[in-house]
Curated annotation (Swiss-Prot):
The gene is Cox7c. It is found in: Mitochondrion inner membrane. It comes from Mus musculus (Mouse). It holds the Pfam family COX7C. The modification N6-acetyllysine is found at residue 25. It is a single-pass membrane protein. This is Cytochrome c oxidase subunit 7C, mitochondrial. Keywords: Acetylation, Membrane, Mitochondrion, Mitochondrion inner membrane, Transit peptide, Transmembrane, Transmembrane helix. PANTHER family: CYTOCHROME C OXIDASE SUBUNIT 7C, MITOCHONDRIAL, CYTOCHROME C OXIDASE SUBUNIT VIIC.
Amino acid sequence: MLGQSIRRFTTSVVRRSHYEEGPGKNLPFSVENKWRLLAMMTVYFGSGFAAPFFIVRHQLLKK
């Protein structure tokens, strides 16, 4: 009995909560400013691409 009432309460709380809906609202970053998004994506993908080269350079220069 207690478990059912707790389950009903938690599901009703979830149903009553409201989040913004629409394209880009469910992402962990903003897509409103396209230039900021471009810079963030360049840094993100660029760092992933450049990391192996810097690691190899570090290993070659190490004595």
